[in-house]
Amino acid sequence: MYTIGQVSEMFHLPISTLRYYDKEGLFPEIERVSNIRKFGEKELEALRVIECLKKSGMEIKDIKQFMKWCSEGNKTYPQRRELFLKQKKAVETEIKRLEKTLDMIRFKCWYYEQAIKDGNEDKINEMLPDKLPEEIQPIYNHAHQITIP
């Protein structure tokens, strides 16, 4: 069993966040000894899932719904699976957006390395948009690709 302070350190979360999660009912079976929360393995696993879902962009109200489904047993497996499929898609979309952002940053790093080497941007601008070095062209193309939602 762990105290709220220990769990706070383990997960790098403020104690106030853990208290908030408890207040919201995300640890329904947490033990209390003399009104002090004691976190067991069940709460730690719940916290891992809660943090995963939060990092994926899910709101607390939806996490609460997931936790409610968990407490309702195996009849809610389809809803839980659907929730994770939806979050998986959201994360994959965000990863694609970040990959494009990273390619723009990679291109600009190369761009300014060349500008520093050449003393100006003239040579680079002559190569744009389609005469860049072989290893840079796909990065440039991806970073400058127009995405229609």
Annotate the PLM regions:
Residues 32, 73-74:
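A short, mixed-charge helix-start or loop-turn motif at secondary-structure junctions
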Residues 7, 25-26, 44, 71, ...:
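Short linear sequence elements within intrinsically disordered, low-complexity coil regions
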Residues 65-68, 72, 84:
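Long, amphipathic alpha-helical segments that form or neighbor coiled-coils/leucine zippers used
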Residues 26, 58, 74-75, 120:
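Residue-level recognition of short, well-ordered coil/turn positions
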Residues 1-68:
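Basic helix-turn-helix/winged-helix DNA-binding cores
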Residues 75-149:
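C-terminal regulatory/oligomerization modules of transcriptional regulators
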